[in-house]
Structure formats: structure tokens, C-alpha cells
Amino acid sequence: MTEKLYYRDAYATKFTARVLDCIEEKKHWTVILDRTLFYPEGGGQPADIGALGGVRVLDVHERGEDIVHTTDKPLPVGAEVEGEIDWEHRFDLMQNHSGEHILSGVICGRYGCDNVGFHMGKESITIDLNTKIPAEDLPYLEEKANEAIWKNVPVGIRYPSKEELAKLEYRSKKELEGQVRIVNVGEYDCCACCGTHVKLAGEIGQIKIIGAQNYKGGTRLELLCGKRALQEFRKKNDVSAEVGRLLSVPAVKADSAVKNVLAERDELLQNLNQLKWKYFTLKAEQVPEGTENILFFGEGLNSKDLTHFADLLLQKGAKRAAVFSKADEGYVFVLLSTEKDARAYTDEMKEPFGCKGGGKPDAVQGRVAAEKKALKKFFADKEFLIAE
């Protein structure tokens, strides 16, 4: 049985312990100590990382009553070793875990719902609630949670007796057996938890909701706390400042400026499309009457352009129209046929041109890795009129 020193003092970073066991498993070693400061993964909180006797601790998990440390090198059984946890990693987890407790407590207290899922990832935290949270309520909930930080509310930990526990209102995701560990944050939350936490809510710094979505009939929230929240704000602030600089407006007006740019872009695209359609119509009118098969080469045409132009050529009386546009490598194309034999052309182009694509008997599209000269010869041999 490993003594859990992290429950004595979540702020301690160094300790000494005796190696009870060390076994090689899949190119790593699993080490069991008589006592440890390393918190094992559990309850939604990732494991601590750090070093033991000069070797790296890569992961930590529970196995029965033992705490198992995964290391990159072996440690001698019976030796006394010095251990040190990565404090920056630990404190980040403490900030985010305590922040999650406060926000969950505020939400569950307001809506009478349950927190049915919790995951603390490398980038952010997600919490799953079994009720739908209105989007317009999120600013209030976020501010209420941060109120605990502003008041610097103490984060207390206690181990109530069965009698005390029976009278206590607390959150828990599952039925608990044995001694229950309760984490209490003033009026904001009371929850059964095995994780490490800050002593004062002020140490969390900030709780920020960065996303919300409907999930399994309830709501999934994404949040950041502490240093993560600061880094996210800094990143977004830098982005908005840069957008403002590029558009020559203050950062706070960047969204309006972007909307104006998008509106101008849409107008330009509309004008461009109108010019394209006029161009396609003009080129189609230049096709000699009685032309049954026609091949056209263009540049900068998208799938919609290719199809539209090929359709215009069919409307002019052609039976088959192949329209190609220069791409990064080779050409993209659309081939339409009133004779229902379009697939035959893509099949024939597979071997010589590496044709990739498909479609229906009367319409195919795809890509070829070929030069214009080779494509011209291929279609000329099939009695296509070449147009550019």
C-alpha cells in the first residue's frame, strides 16, 4: 500500500521514498514506492509528471492500493530515492480542477442538474451536464463562478463520518464506498473528489467558458482556468490586434471591419460570376453549328464553372462537352454527354493520364496529371473540336 503524500500537502514538490518494486513492461518500467507525492490519473484529473531518483516519471496510475509510477529507466528495489513533481504541471491541474468545481457547483445549484462528465485535457476542460443551458445564461454563470475568485473563498477539504455525510448535500458522479473526501468552496460548491486543489479560490485567477454545445440531450461546456485562461486571452487579443492593424481600425472594431470586407468580397464575387457567365455564353456562341464534340481549356475555373460552361455547350447542340481547367498538377475537368457514355472517357484516361474521378453516365468530373498537348491529341483522335 502506497502512502498518498499529495493528500497531506498538495503544494509539496519534493519527497523521499523507498522503492518496493520495479518491473519492466513494454520498454518502460513500473515502479511502486512506499509513499509518493505523485498524483495518479483519476477522477478526470491527469497524472503528475516529474522525476524519481534521476529518471523521468511518464505516467502514474492506481493498481489496487498501490500507486504505480511509469518511468523511462529502472530503479533498484530497496533503494531510497528522491522524487520531485513538475510543479507547473501540478499547479495548472489544481487551478483548472478547482475552477471546474466552482463552475459546476454554480450551474448545478442554479438548474438542479448533474455534472455527468468531466475531462481535463492538455488544452482545455470539458464538463457535461444533463440539462440544456441557455446560451444567454452563460455570461451570468461565468461571472458568478469568478465571484468566488474575487472573494478569495477558502477551498476546504474534509473527511466526514457516515453520519455527517448522510446529512450533507454534495455533488457526486457515482455511489461512493468507504471514506469520502469532500471538497468545499464556500457557498459555491460541495463535491466528493479525490483530486488536488488550491487552498484559496483567488489562486485560480480566472474561469472562462470558451465553448458550449448540445451534447446527449444536455450541454457540454469547454472552459479554461488560471494560466490557461490568461494565455488564451493573450492569444485572442494578439489576433484581434493584428486584424485591426491589417484593416487599419482599432481592435475593438475589427469585427465590423471584417464584415465590411466580406460584404465587398461577396459583391466582387457576384460581379466576377456575372462576367464569367457572359464569357461562357460568348465562347459557346462561337462554336460552329453542327459541332458534336468539343474540348475547351481554361484557367481558374471551379467545379461550378466547369459544369455551367459544359452545359452551355450542350445547349448549343453538342453531344459531348469536355471542359478542362489548369490545376496545381495537371487539370481538373467536367465532361457531359447526351449519349450517356461519359464514363467511358474517364476509364480511357486512367492509364495514360492517371485520371481520378467519376460520376454518372451523362456527367463525370475528375482530375488528370497530363500536359495539354497530350490531352489535345487524346480528344482529337476522338473527333473533338479543340477550343481555348
Task: Show where each model-derived region lies.
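A glycine- and charged-residue-rich anion-binding loop/surface
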Residues: M1-E388
